Amino acid sequence: MSRLLTDFPMKKKRSDDARHIEGWQSKNERIESLLNVLYDFRFNTVKSRTEYRAASSSGLYQPVTKFVLNSFRRRLDATAGIVTSAENIRTILESDFARKVHPIREYFNALPLLNPTEHGHIGRLLNTVQVANPGKWEEYFTKWLIGVVANAMNDTGCQNHTCLVLTGDRQGQFKSWWLDNLCPTPLKNYLFTGKIDPQGKDILTLIAEYLFINIDDQLKELNKQNENALKNLITTPAVKYRRPYDVYIEEYPTLPASWLR
C-alpha cells in the first residue's frame, strides 16, 4: 500500500542556539573566526570600503584590494583547508562583520583639549606666512580652520563656506608645500593635491572622500562656467551619486576644505 509524502513527518530544522551549543559552525562562521584571529578589520565610512591590518598591531589600516582578497583566500586554504571564493570573502567583509569607523572624526576625538589663548598654536602657525594684512589673515584663517573641523564632525549641512587662497608674485614660494603640511600626517589619505575638473564626474568622489583639496595653480585658469561650478561645490552640503562598482545611488556628506592659490 502506497503512502503519501505527507504521512512522513518533516524533520525539524535545528535552531541557531542548538547549533552553537553543539559547537557546530557554518563554513562562513569558520572563515570569520579565522579572519578575526589573523587580522583586524574596519569599514571606512568616508572611503566606503573595508580596511585591514595584522591582528593586535598598531600599524595603519590598508584598503582591502582585489590582490588582498585573493591573498586572504589563499591563506584560508593553506591554514585551515577552507576553500572559498574571493567574492564570498568580500561579501563577508562588506557587512556588519567589520565595525563602521569614521577615521577623520576618530582622529579629532582623540586629540587633547587645549586652551587656544594659553598655547597660541594658531598664532605661531600664522607667523610662518608673510602677508600684507596680518589682522585679516588671522581672522579668516581661524574662521576657515574652525570650519574645517566643524564640517568633518557633522554630516548635516555645510559648515565651511570659506576657501583659503594664497597668492604670490612668483613660483617657488612653498605655497603648495605649506598648504599640504596643514594636513596631519595620520590624515594624509584624505589630502588631494592637483588639478580638478569642477564639472567632471570624478569631482563627486573627491568632495565625498577628501578632507583637504589643494588646487595647485588653477585659480587663474578657470573660466566663468568652471568658477561658478567650483563655488557651488564648496558650499554643497551633500552629493548623490553611485560609486564605482556600487549598485545604488547614495547620498554622501561633503568633506573638503578647498584651497586655491
For each of these PLM feature ranges, what is it?
Residues C158, N226, Y252-P253:
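Short glycine/proline-enriched turns and hinge-like loops at secondary-structure junctions
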Residues S95-F212:
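P-loop NTPase catalytic core of nucleic-acid-dependent motor ATPases
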Residues L211-I234:
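Conserved AAA+/SF3 P-loop NTPase catalytic/coupling segment centered on the Walker-B
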Residues I203-A208, R243-R261:
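AAA+/SF3 P-loop NTPase mechanochemical coupling elements
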Residues E227-E250:
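Conserved catalytic/switch belt of AAA+ P-loop NTPases
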Residues F41-K47, K188-Y190, P237-R243:
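Short secondary-structure junctions
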Residues M1-T117, G135, E139:
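N-terminal nucleic-acid engagement/recognition segments and initiation subdomains in replication
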